[in-house]
């Protein structure tokens, strides 16, 4: 009897292999472009360059301080947010989630409006007869901006760890009269300590690869990171060899940080509980006072820069700026790039997870992890490094394109894949556990399964992943900083041009439009599935 010929590659493996091959090939091409353009001279002299080591040391130092100042206060803020219920709590938690994807230049504009020499606090001190000596430039300004972005995110992640503590443990501790330090040590700390290392590693990596923040607030050669040095080598000195060497150093450092982050990221077993909603509010007076102070301080950190963007944007230049065709051209370019990059990111992420979950279901755990790791690999090549590789590759072959749309869209899509993976990974696994046997028994597979099962059950996670990818892309400045020009502007690039030419009032209007566009785009996309959508 004739046997049916088996395909060389199973159909369920093709999507993941295709996406992983594309991502790895792009990363490899960028790496080779950097390697070929790296200086071939005396490497000993390069490694003895004192300024190079100053840049490397400063990159690590500011990332370490940023992670420390973000994670330690987040522990106490997360406990306060868990214990207290107050009007606006859900809005505050939503704001904590939004700071990660807030355009960097918008936040920087707000921070300068509040903490700058002519800012709100300086005016307040002047009216009180005090001298305002804080400068938002240099290391202190970089740390302030990084804490603004990352402390809310760390608080949100640590709050999730506290919410995973079984209600029975909390109830038993309350019955035993366990309070204060003992409750934190024996009940909360075992759950927090498993979440703190991966959160700290993630924040360290994000701050180490920070570009727009350091570019705006660095304040000179003493506060320069590797990414900023790459940008300076290409944009000001046009020294591709030095840029390639710096990009290689950045890539090696980030790859080590990615591997460390993956090593520290251990899944927290949720366990089973019958009292998931039970909590002990700890209504002692000093506890309520401490929690209130922490929450108020968090609000004072988050709200003033955002309010400053809104207030400063509503100035007398508003009608004139809105009448400029350049603004609407930049807005349309940003929207076009963001939507295209978001869709491409979600498609590539679904392809990776589709095959990786099938590998896991067949007990091929190592292969499944390797496929997912290919999506995280792009974290080892920050946007400025990837863009540098593309810049050198195109410049040495076919020449730089007239329009950078394709490069920016593709790069932004790749940079958003790790975030989309985190959003879709667990829902995809849950669907496999719930519907895999049923689909096999009914013979539903491939496109039919995608249409009947995944696209229906994943409406909310898909919308959330698309929203994150689009807003991350619309606020990106690292990639467009290399390819942007007068004929190709995004809103962040246009805002940077306005700030650089000291058109602060025009820049305030642009920052307000960019802020409103991000919040509107995120909200609209996240609401696409509908309020009453069912995922069962």
Residue ranges and their predicted role:
Residues 7-41, 50-163, 191-216, 245-262, ...:
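Membrane-water interface segments at the C-terminal ends of transmembrane alpha-helices
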Residues 113, 212-238, 476-504:
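Glycine-rich helix-loop "coupling/hinge" segments at transmembrane-helix boundaries
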Residues 163-192, 359, 437-458:
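Short helix-to-coil transition segments within interhelical loops
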Residues 34-45, 116-128, 218-227, 268-275, ...:
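Peri-membrane helix termini and adjoining interfacial loops of integral membrane proteins
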Residues 171, 179-183, 268-282, 317-318, ...:
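Juxtamembrane inter-helical linkers in multi-pass membrane proteins
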Residues 45, 90-93, 126, 167-175, ...:
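Short amphipathic alpha-helical coupling elements at transmembrane boundaries
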Residues 4, 263-294:
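Flexible interhelical linker loops that connect adjacent transmembrane helices
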Residues 270-281, 361-362, 528-536:
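Short cytosolic juxtamembrane segments of multi-pass membrane proteins
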